[in-house]
């Protein structure tokens, strides 16, 4: 199970990303599956995260997935 991710508003995310200099973009592909009676039908979707080192040495992951990520 993935560690919990804080949910932040866009303005808060942008402020946090401006402070981080050592950031890299990470992606994760998940599947959303549904059973249609005979088979499972799974649709992959991508999630994007900005992974930044903060001043105290911790790693901060901020999800930056938007509506255009999976188009």
Curated annotation (Swiss-Prot):
Disulphide bonds in the chain: none
Which GO CC terms are listed, alphabetically? mitochondrial inner membrane peptidase complex
The alphabetical list of record keywords is:
Membrane, Mitochondrion, Mitochondrion inner membrane, Transit peptide
Q: Which domain of life is it from?
A: Eukaryota
Recorded hits in Pfam families, A to Z, give:
Mitochondr_Som1
Q: Zinc: present as a keyword of the record?
A: no
Give the subcellular location. Answer: Mitochondrion inner membrane
Q: State what this protein does.
A: Required for mitochondrial inner membrane peptidase function.
Q: What is this protein called?
A: Protein SOM1, mitochondrial
UniProt organism field: Kluyveromyces lactis (strain ATCC 8585 / CBS 2359 / DSM 70799 / NBRC 1267 / NRRL Y-1140 / WM37) (Yeast)
């Amino acid at each position: 199970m993935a560690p919990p991710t804080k949910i932040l508003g866009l303005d808060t995310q942008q402020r946090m990303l401006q402070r981080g200099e050592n950031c890299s973009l990470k992606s994760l592909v998940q599947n959303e599956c549904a059973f249609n009676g005979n088979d499972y039908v799974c649709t992959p979707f991508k999630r994007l995260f900005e992974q930044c080192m903060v001043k105290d040495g911790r790693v901060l992951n901020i999800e930056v997935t938007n509506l255009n990520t999976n188009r």
